[in-house]
Amino acid sequence: MLLIPAIDLKDGQCVRLKQGDMDQATVFSEDPAAMARHWVDQGARRLHLVDLNGAFVGKPRNEAAIKAIIAEVGSEIPVQLGGGIRDLNTIERWLDDGLSYVIIGTAAVKNPGFLQDACTAFGGHIIVGLDARDGKVATDGWSKLTGHEVVDLARKYEDYGVESIIYTDIGRDGMLQGINIDATVKLAQSVSIPVIASGGLSSLKDIDHLCAVESEGVEGVICGRAIYSGDLNFREAQDHADKLGAA
């Protein structure tokens, strides 16, 4: 089970939001590259970056911070980025700059043809981000709710060659209420694409639940507020997951 620290970027700073609300941002660091180094030193094997400003405006906005993170740790572990990625040129530029994976969210929902083109051009590097509230997919920085069911969209993407799906339960994001295991497993069982859980991780108990369903196709989890607030020690959590995986 891969535990992936999240670094959410707003105005060049590392922040955490509650339920995607930009007005409820807590600043955890003004040096995102140093934060990236911290997580690598704590044993992270991949990093998850989100350009929050970019997600809302539809184009990259925290480029300096992202490039600084890639320069700091990109040669050591894979780095993935989501937020504001809506065209092939942006994907190519980020991959050339050293990102390992690019996450397509809103654009995948609104323009499936773009996602298909991206998977064809950059096979093995494209992750889809499906963000949902009560089972319905949300777009545009979670500000717009669609009528699409998560599982229906995921099945559609299966033939495109998507590397994995990050499934976020918006209602639990930043709330430390625990992962929505049932919805995550339902999605993982419905498709052959590996699923990464996101939203609500709060304790080693969540890690236990996730490791128990790893064989269903849940390959990892994004770690957010809990590792910043101190509710969860990242190194301890990854070690715990490794021991369960080896058992």
From Swiss-Prot:
NCBIfam families according to UniProt: 1-(5-phosphoribosyl)-5-[(5-phosphoribosylamino)methylideneamino]imidazole-4-carboxamide isomerase, PRK13585.1
Enzyme class: isomerase
Family: Belongs to the HisA/HisF family.
Pathway named in the protein's UniProt entry: Amino-acid biosynthesis; L-histidine biosynthesis; L-histidine from 5-phospho-alpha-D-ribose 1-diphosphate: step 4/9
GO (cellular component) term, any one: cytoplasm
Name this protein carries in UniProt: 1-(5-phosphoribosyl)-5-[(5-phosphoribosylamino)methylideneamino] imidazole-4-carboxamide isomerase
Stored PANTHER family: 1-(5-PHOSPHORIBOSYL)-5-[(5-PHOSPHORIBOSYLAMINO)METHYLIDENEAMINO] IMIDAZOLE-4-CARBOXAMIDE ISOMERASE
An example Gene Ontology molecular-function term: 1-(5-phosphoribosyl)-5-[(5-phosphoribosylamino)methylideneamino]imidazole-4-carboxamide isomerase activity
Gene designation: hisA
Region forming the signal peptide: none
Domain of life assignment: Bacteria
Keyword line: Amino-acid biosynthesis, Cytoplasm, Histidine biosynthesis, Isomerase
EC number: 5.3.1.16
InterPro entries, A to Z: Aldolase_TIM, His_biosynth, HisA_bact_arch, Isoase_HisA-like, Isoase_HisA-like_bact, RibuloseP-bd_barrel
Subcellular location: Cytoplasm
Annotated source species: Ralstonia nicotianae (strain ATCC BAA-1114 / GMI1000) (Ralstonia solanacearum)
Biological process according to GO: L-histidine biosynthetic process; L-tryptophan biosynthetic process
Active site, renumbered: D8, D131
Catalyzed reactions per annotation: 1-(5-phospho-beta-D-ribosyl)-5-[(5-phospho-beta-D-ribosylamino)methylideneamino]imidazole-4-carboxamide = 5-[(5-phospho-1-deoxy-D-ribulos-1-ylimino)methylamino]-1-(5-phospho-beta-D-ribosyl)imidazole-4-carboxamide
